[in-house]
Design a protein with these regions (language model features):
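Bacterial Sec-dependent N-terminal signal peptides
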Residues: 1-35
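Metalloprotease/metallohydrolase-associated module, dominated by Zn2+-dependent proteases
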Residues: 22-31, 35-63, 69-76, 97-106, ...
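Acidic helix-start/capping segments at beta-turn-to-alpha-helix junctions
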Residues: 77-93
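Active-site-proximal beta-strand/loop segments in catalytic clefts of secreted hydrolases
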Residues: 84-89, 118-119, 136, 164-168
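Short pre-active-site segment immediately N-terminal to the catalytic Zn-binding motif
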Residues: 115-133
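Active-site recognition of the HExxH zinc-binding catalytic motif
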Residues: 130-144
Length: 200
């Protein structure tokens, strides 16, 4: 009888361990599937071609396609495009350390020209690169100005539009970029301003 009880308890223990093991494998599979679904939802296939090795020209091509799909009639066709990397000393002429780029020749309707500080770009995540690129393209192509000058800012806004700063926070998410980018193309942010390019 004692032997039967031992066998019974051993069998019961083995069954419990087997069922627990199956439950853990099933739980891991469910968790893996959920994580994969979340990752797939976060990456818009439109941006899938951009990676750590993408060039400024790749970002420009993406910007143009994005502008078109957002309803912009002329994202810059027929213009001379001049995108390049600069270095920090290039910015010694009054541009502050919270800027990662600079637009040139903004009032010339035949060009789109801007530079991005290469050392910043190399350290940026893809989301930060998207923010910086769209910010500088906003100056160079659409003549957007920053919503406020530094001297006018008395408190931080609740939301930071793409044209607020050319350097997005490290923890900026892809979802935030998509929302801000949509507002960017719709000109939907507080205090939209343009460079004055009228000839006096």
């Amino acid at each position: 009888m004692k032997m039967k009880m031992k066998f019974y308890y051993l069998s019961l223990s083995a069954l419990f361990i087997f069922l627990q093991s199956c439950d853990n494998e099933e739980q891991e599979q469910i968790e893996t599937n959920v994580v994969e679904e979340i990752v797939e939802e976060e990456v818009d296939p439109f941006y899938a071609g951009i990676n750590e090795n993408s060039t400024l020209d790749d970002y420009w091509d993406l910007f143009v396609k994005d502008a078109i799909r957002s309803g912009k009639a002329d994202p810059g066709f027929g213009r001379t495009i001049n995108l390049f990397f600069g270095s920090e000393p290039d910015f010694a002429s009054g541009v502050t350390a919270d800027h990662a780029g600079r637009a040139y020749d903004i009032c010339n309707d035949e060009t789109v020209s801007f530079e991005i500080i290469e050392s910043f770009w190399e350290d940026f995540s893809i989301v930060q690169r998207l923010y910086t690129f769209y910010h500088e393209a906003g100056h160079a192509r659409y003549k957007y100005r920053h919503p406020y000058e530094a001297s006018e800012v008395t408190s931080r806004p609740e939301e930071y539009p793409i044209m607020w700063l050319s350097m997005a926070a490290e923890n900026s998410t892809f979802e935030e970029f998509i929302k801000d980018k949509n507002n960017f193309f719709k000109r939907n942010w507080e205090n939209v301003r343009y460079f004055n390019c009228s000839e006096d």
